Amino acid sequence: MNYFSVIMYLINSVIFTFMIFLTFVNPSLLNDQYWVYILIGFFTAIVFHSGYQAGKGSEK
């Protein structure tokens, strides 16, 4: 088990959840294109990381 990988996944998840919360509190953030790009980036990182971890687990 790669602890660095797990820690980075948790950090990404917490930041993404906090950003989604801020978006619900202040929907005008969606008018800022960079905010949307950052949200998409964090979501993509979480999805790719989940798939990578699942693929590593199935090799054993």
From Swiss-Prot:
Membrane spanning residue stretches: 4-24, 35-55
Record membrane topology: Multi-pass membrane protein
Domain of life: Viruses
Keyword Kinase applies: no
Location in the cell: Host membrane
Primary location recorded for the protein, binned into one broad class: host cell
UniProt KW keywords: Host membrane, Membrane, Transmembrane, Transmembrane helix
GO cellular component, one term: host cell membrane
Entry protein name: Putative transmembrane protein 74
Species the sequence originates in: Sulfolobus islandicus filamentous virus (isolate Iceland/Hveragerdi) (SIFV)
